[in-house]
């Protein structure tokens, strides 16, 4: 799948991870690295978790493992530390271990949207689409607004992966209604599909964006490039005119004027 489904970077109460340098600073404040205090300090466990996930997203797997293992050792009953290890095990391809860890986390936090979304993403990555959708559907029933948007988005991309276009369109459109900021990720995905030469997938994502959100310079530029590639000169000029009227100072309009498709 070209769009990551994992919600690991938003594991801690829906907030993105801090930069590595900031996490190091916090770690030094709450207790010296590898000091005896670290073994029982819950704040250190959360900092180790954040640090491990930051290393994971930067693909520094050895450092990620070391910090996530320390987080689990300090706070083994905290579902967040166990979920962090599940994400690591999933990343390195230890799917059997990840499955066991996810089941453990589900028992620890059965009504948690982040757990459901991450487990659903894991199942979707294995092609277990029906089981994945059960997790996403359960997460979508939770009252937390952001978790509903995440669940709809993940379910939509899972259907997108499975080639179930109608369901993908419906769910991704709903996700954008809940959280319009998700349009940024959708356009990024559409650009990746376009660069990979996947015209039908690109068209679908453009249509979802177009029918759900106001046009942006980036969305218009993608439509222009798509029309140019397809030889639809009328559409290319039409979108170019909209770009000129709405975003005359944008870099996308400068590319259009230079015919840099």
Model feature map: region roles:
Residues 211-261:
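Terminal, low-structured helical/coil segments at or just beyond the last alpha-helical repeat
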Residues 57, 91-92, 125-126, 161, ...:
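Register position in tetratricopeptide repeats
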Residues 74, 108, 142-144, 178, ...:
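Structural marker of alpha-solenoid helical repeat scaffolds
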Residues 29-47:
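Bacterial Sec signal peptide processing site at the extreme N-terminus
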């Amino acid at each position: 799948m070209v769009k990551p489904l994992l919600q690991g970077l938003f594991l801690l109460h829906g907030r993105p991870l801090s930069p590595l340098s900031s996490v190091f600073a916090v770690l030094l404040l709450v207790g010296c690295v590898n000091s005896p205090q670290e073994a029982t300090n819950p704040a250190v466990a959360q900092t180790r978790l954040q640090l491990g996930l930051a290393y994971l997203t930067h693909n520094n797997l050895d450092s990620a493992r070391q910090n996530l293992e320390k987080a689990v050792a300090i706070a083994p009953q905290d579902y967040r530390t166990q979920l962090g290890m599940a994400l690591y095990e999933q990343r390195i391809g230890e799917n059997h271990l990840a499955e066991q860890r996810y089941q453990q986390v589900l028992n620890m936090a059965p009504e948690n949207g982040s757990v459901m979304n991450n487990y659903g993403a894991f199942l979707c990555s294995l092609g277990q689409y029906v089981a994945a959708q059960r997790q996403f559907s359960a997460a979508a029933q939770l009252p937390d607004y952001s978790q509903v948007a995440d669940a709809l988005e993940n379910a939509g991309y899972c259907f997108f992966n499975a080639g179930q276009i109608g369901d993908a369109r419906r769910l991704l459109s709903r996700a954008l209604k809940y959280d319009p900021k998700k349009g940024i990720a959708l356009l990024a995905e559409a650009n990746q599909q376009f660069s990979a030469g996947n015209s039908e997938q690109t068209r679908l994502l453009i249509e979802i964006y177009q029918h759900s959100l106001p046009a942006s310079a980036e969305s218009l530029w993608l439509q222009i490039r798509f029309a140019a590639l397809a030889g639809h000169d009328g559409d290319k000029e039409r979108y170019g005119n909209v770009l000129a009227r709405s975003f005359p100072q944008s870099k996308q309009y400068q590319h259009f004027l230079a015919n840099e498709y």
